Amino acid sequence: MAELTHLDPEGRPVMVDVSPKAVTRRVAVAAGYLELDDPAAEALTQGGGPKGDPWSVARLGAVGGVKRTSDLIPLAHPLAIEAVDVVHHWDPAQRRAWLRVQVSCEGRTGIEMEALAGVSVGLLVLYDMLKAVSHGMTLGPARLLRKEGGRRGVVTLPWEDCPWTP
């Protein structure tokens, strides 16, 4: 079984000391979706609800989620984010509004939590933008698709339903 690095020998949570690690290029890509009912799907495809363009605001929310990760996740290190790329995709057959977030930096620790936080917050913002039309939406799963850097190097995690390849 893998060792849980965020616990001390007594089982108490600690922030890991990353100072001995080498600074390397870190990249993480995560994706997730919001499943919409018919009224929300119609509002999204028609350019939005009463609050404006949902995609644009969700993209901004995703960037904000990336930037605030260390405030939201207690043991996450604050990182000097160098780039955030947010892409959206509408799947009309399954009524899924997808977001993909890629984050990069030079650092001593992984950036996966930032990518996942970005996707999660972006999807919550999308829900917020459409809830005036309908509350019949389901926040779907979000998951890591790819990470680069650190001792494991490149890790890809394919997701069959996802519109993007890792």
Show where each model-derived region lies.
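C-terminal binding/interaction regions
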Residues: 1-55, 60-166
